[in-house]
């Protein structure tokens, strides 16, 4: 296994990991059941907003939300639209407590532009989302940005509808050390 970079406290530097590596940690051990329960509660809370496609992955330990980029940005723009606030605000609670969640922002595009354009666009859009969270009181110390460009389509890029589905933001809420520690101390249910 490759050696993982650590910060000055000895914690793994999540910014140096691939998305797949981030999605595979932490090993929850005995706390898995409590974490799954907490993630189910968080999913139910987010479902009330009815603004994104939600699912639990990795044995129900990681919450994945998918938001349409058209709800966040104007076409080919990197500035958040006025209505983006409606879609992003429900996720602020996940960023209130530092290291409660490791949040992965994965921005996708369709394949209508060049590879370089798509990567630049998705990078700028993901940064705009992270900056919005910061401006609105979220702690973004444990937020990692991934620009996916057009590399991971979920629909055919041959149709308008397919391209619209491919332009999306995936938000992954991965249990952080604070959440695991709270589960260990029996404080997660409070």
Predicted regions: what they are:
Residues 16-17, 24-34, 63-67, 104-106, ...:
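A broad, low-specificity signal for short, low-complexity segments enriched in glycine/proline
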Residues 28-33, 72-81, 115-119:
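Second-shell loop/turn segments in exported
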Residues 39-58, 73-107, 134, 171, ...:
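Periplasmic peptidoglycan-binding/anchoring modules of Gram-negative envelope and division proteins
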Residues 55-57, 62-68, 72, 102-106, ...:
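Soluble periplasmic/extracytoplasmic beta-strand elements of cell-envelope proteins
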Residues 69-71, 77, 149, 158:
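Short, well-ordered turn and helix-capping elements at secondary-structure junctions
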Residues 108-187:
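Periplasmic OmpA-like peptidoglycan-binding domain that tethers envelope proteins to the cell wall
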């Amino acid at each position: 296994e490759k050696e993982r970079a650590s910060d000055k406290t000895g914690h793994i530097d999540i910014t140096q990991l691939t998305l797949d590596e981030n999605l595979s940690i932490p090993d929850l051990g005995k706390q898995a059941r409590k974490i799954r329960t907490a993630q189910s509660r968080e999913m139910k809370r987010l479902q009330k907003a009815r603004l994104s496609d939600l699912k639990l992955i990795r044995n129900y330990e990681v919450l994945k939300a998918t938001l349409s980029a058209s709800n966040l940005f104007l076409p080919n723009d990197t500035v958040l639209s006025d209505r983006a606030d409606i879609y992003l605000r429900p996720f602020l609670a996940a960023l209130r407590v530092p290291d409660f969640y490791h949040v992965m922002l994965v921005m996708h595009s369709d394949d209508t532009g060049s590879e370089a354009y798509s990567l630049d666009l998705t990078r700028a859009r993901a940064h705009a989302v992270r900056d919005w969270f910061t401006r609105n009181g979220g702690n973004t110390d444990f937020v990692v940005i991934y620009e996916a460009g057009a590399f991971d389509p979920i629909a055919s890029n041959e149709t308008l509808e397919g391209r619209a589905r491919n332009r999306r933001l995936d938000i992954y809420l991965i249990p952080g050390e604070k959440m695991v520690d709270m589960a260990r101390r029996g404080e997660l249910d409070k």
